[in-house]
């Protein structure tokens, strides 16, 4: 309380602006690239009545911010003191170099939205196993990606079926390891009484001839077969008188 002085007094009111809340909502475009957006975060602050607020434009990896900041003129109605920012999702390039291999369609490629789950191609190539030149990301990062298949030729067990023949000279009759796309290398020569060795073949009958220079095209363990040609003998008969 104050005591009235013995003279006229003039009092002046002093007003302080009230503080009212405002909200800034940050929305991000959905990963499917549709026109739907999901709220990433909301920021709640207060400011004086009639203040003009220009909320911060945040930066989010993989998204493009709106071109201009919005303004909020603070009023007593906090429900109206709202600014909504919508961020579009960026696209990045994703490519797969199969390097001579093949893959069934359905894998992720082309221009891909940020954070999209990546489905890698199931790459196949006869006689080879595949790895990629770098680790495959689970989701699309905020950068372009270019993968390349690295193929490794497979090795298989080769069995030699002698068909009654036996080894002469260099070489052994055994099971050996051969590699797809490379030559069979040294193959033994065989002998068989009454026959001439005609080489190794891919089938017991028919098939194709397999030499040391033949490239392996089989895609698994396999057998080659020795083939022989009967020797024809000329028999002359003589009578008792030598005629």
Residue ranges of each PLM-predicted region?
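Secondary-structure capping and domain/repeat boundary segments
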Residues: 1-243
């Amino acid at each position: 309380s104050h005591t009235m002085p013995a003279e006229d007094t003039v009092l002046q009111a002093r007003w302080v602006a009230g503080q009212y809340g405002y909200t800034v909502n940050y929305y991000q475009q959905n990963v499917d690239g549709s026109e739907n957006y999901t709220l990433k975060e909301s920021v709640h602050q207060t400011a004086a009545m009639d203040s003009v607020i220009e909320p911060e434009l945040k930066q989010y990896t993989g998204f493009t911010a709106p071109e201009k900041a919005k303004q909020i003129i603070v009023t007593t109605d906090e429900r109206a003191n709202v600014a909504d920012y919508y961020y579009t999702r960026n696209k990045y390039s994703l490519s797969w170099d199969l390097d001579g291999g093949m893959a069934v369609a359905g894998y992720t490629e082309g221009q891909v939205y940020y954070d999209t789950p990546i489905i890698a191609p199931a790459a196949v190539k006869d006689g080879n196993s595949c790895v990629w030149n770098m680790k495959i990301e689970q989701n699309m990062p905020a950068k372009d990606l270019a993968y390349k298949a690295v193929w490794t030729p497979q090795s298989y067990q080769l069995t030699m079926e002698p068909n009654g023949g036996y080894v002469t000279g260099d070489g052994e009759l055994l099971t050996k390891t051969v590699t797809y796309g490379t030559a069979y290398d040294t193959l033994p020569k065989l002998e068989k009484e009454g026959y001439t060795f005609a080489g190794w073949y891919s089938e017991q009958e028919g098939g194709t001839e397999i030499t040391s220079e033949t490239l392996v095209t089989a895609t698994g363990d396999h057998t080659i077969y020795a083939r022989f040609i009967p020797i024809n003998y000329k028999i002359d008969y003589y009578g008792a008188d030598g005629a």
